[in-house]
């Protein structure tokens, strides 16, 4: 696990749960890249070929369920099995009053230092 990617994932899962929404763009206009960079994963300045990806989900009750959901989605699965990614971080947050209750984030990265 990569601490900056975990920090970004957990922070964004908490934000989606507390604000009751599911989107790659935060209500504050933040993007996966900006959140990951802010958390300390310096992917923008590390190498020309560095990259990141974010998978999000909501409503699944367990890690197994969310991983199965991502595996059934072509774009999410493509992120998870991309051999270029060498770092990962996960986050999950619960808000019983929110529509989906549980919110999940998986961040993937390559080219920066964890």
Task: Describe every region a protein language model picked out.
Residues 49, 53, 57-114:
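Disulfide-stabilized extracellular recognition modules
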Residues 3-60, 80-82:
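Short, surface-exposed glycine/acidic/tryptophan-bearing loops
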């Amino acid at each position: 696990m990569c601490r900056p990617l975990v920090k970004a994932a957990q922070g964004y899962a908490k934000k989606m749960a507390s604000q009751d929404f599911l989107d790659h763009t935060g209500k504050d206009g933040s993007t996966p890249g900006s959140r990951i960079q802010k958390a300390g994963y310096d992917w923008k300045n590390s190498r020309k070929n560095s990259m990141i990806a974010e998978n999000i989900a909501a409503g699944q009750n367990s890690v197994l369920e969310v991983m199965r959901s991502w595996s059934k989605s072509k774009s999410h699965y493509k992120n998870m099995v991309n051999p270029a990614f060498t770092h990962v971080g996960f986050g999950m947050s619960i808000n019983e009053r929110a529509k989906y209750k549980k919110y999940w984030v998986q961040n993937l990265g390559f080219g920066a230092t964890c």
